[in-house]
Amino acid sequence: MNAYDLTRRVYDVDLWWQPVRHRFRRWSSYDPAGNTLLDYDKFVRVAGNVGVLAETPESGAIVRIWTASDVNRQVRMFQGGAGKPFLDAPLPALFDGSFNNRTMFQTGVDFSVTDEKQWPFVPPFTGTHRGAYVCRVPIPFRDGLRVEADLIANPRVGLFYHIDCLLADEPQDVHGFDGRFAYRDFTVRHAESIHANPLAFYADELLGARCVPFQGRGDRVTLLNVKGAGLVRRLTYRLTDVSLENLHDLRLTISYGNRPPSFHAAVSLLHCAAFELHGYRSRALGYVDGAFHFQFPIPFRDDVTIALESITGRTFGVEGEALLLDREPPAGALLLHSHSAFDAGAEPSRYVFADFPAASGRYVGLAFSCKPYQQEDNEVITADGEVVARGTGREDYFNMAWGFKEYGAPDHGCPVQSGEWPWQDLQRGHGYYSAYRHHFNESIPFRRSFEACFEKDHDPAKVGHGWASTAFLYLTQPQTANAIPADWRRWAKPE
C-alpha cells in the first residue's frame, strides 16, 4: 500500500475483482442522535479549540476526503504518534488548487526542484462537485493516524465531513506518505484521460482481448456463452423495439456455471433511467448515442452466460459486442454480483440496498433512483457485523452536497434530476432523481457479511417516498442475485 499504486488506480475497475487485503473505515460528522439536519461539527473528541476528525493506531491510507464546508480553518495530519504534523494546511487548500507543498508539507522531501507547488493536491484528484469538495489524493500512514481541525465558534460554518480510510491487514506493506514527484506525470495524465472519456480503455487489445459480436431477437437473447475460464472486459449493445417503459421489464443476467443468475438487474435501473433516459458516461456504465455500455469486469472460472430477457415476454432486438480475455483469472479473483431492491415507501424506517448475511468480497457501488425527491437520509454500512461507515445525507454519499443536480463524473453522477427549490417543496412530495456511485480505492471489503442501507429520517410527511436500486458487489463464491420485483415498473414513472 503506497501512494503511487493507490494514485494510479484511483479509477481502476480491476481493483474490484482482486482478493481483499485490507479493511475499510470512515470517520464522519454524523449526528449520533439521528438528526440528519445536525450532521456537522461532530468529532471523535475535542481538545481545547481543536476537533479530532479521525484517529486510529493502525496503518493504512486515506483514500477520500469529502466536505460541504469551504471555511478557511486549519487541518493537520499526524502519523505514528508524532507530535509534529506531516501536513498542516487550510482546509480549502486540499481541494481548490491553493496547496503549497513547500510550506504545508513536513515530509523531508525537497520540492524546490519544481515550480508545481500544488502537487499532489491537483485536479482531477481534487475538485468541487455540485457544492461538495472531494479529495481523492491517497495519503498512506504508518503506525497510526490523527486528523484534526481548528474549531470555529460560528454555527453558520459547521464542518460536514467524511474521511474514508483503508486499514492494512499487513502493516509492514504500507509505505508512509511523502508527496514525492516520481509518479506525478503518469498518474495525472492517466486520470485526466479518464475524466475526458470515462468509457475509454486502451490496453485490452494489447493483452489479447478479442471482440465477440452478438445479435438476436426474442423475449430472451443470450449475448455470450463461454465455456471454461476467462474475463469479460465489457459489453456494448443497442436495443430495438424497446420503449422506456418496456426497458423496466428488460433484465441483464449473468450466470456462472449452471447456477441461477448471480447478477440480475433491470436495464433501466442500471442506467439511471427509472424516470427518463439521458446520456451519461461513467467508468463502469454509460449510455451514449443509443448504445448501452456495461464495463464492470466479469471474471469467471467455470463457464459464464450473459443474457437479456423480458420478464413480460415482449419481443425485442439486440446487437452488440463483448470484449473477452481467454485466460484464467488469477487465483482468488472475485465474481460480479448484484443486489436489486425496491421500496414503495410505506414505512419510514430503513431502505436496505445490499444484504449478504453470509458472504465474502467487496461492495463497489450503487445505481439509485428516488421519487419523490428526498435527500436527508444517511447511509449506514456494516461489514462483518461492525458499522464501518455512516453518512451525513444521501447526496453526500453520491459526492455532492446541498441537494442533487444533474452532473457526471467517472465515479459518481446524477444523470436525471427533476424538481426545484426550496427543499421543503422537494422533500414533501415533488421531484425525482437517479444517481450512481462507484467505489474504486474506497471499495468496502467484507469477509463474513455485509449490509448497506439508507436510514430514513422518520418524518411522517415523507411516507410514500419510493426507492429503487441495484448494488454492485464482487464475491468469492457465486450466490443467487436478489431481483427487483416486477411491480416496480408501476412506480417508475416521472409523475
Predicted regions span which residues?
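Beta-strand-centric surfaces of beta-sandwich/beta-rich domains
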Residues: M1-E495
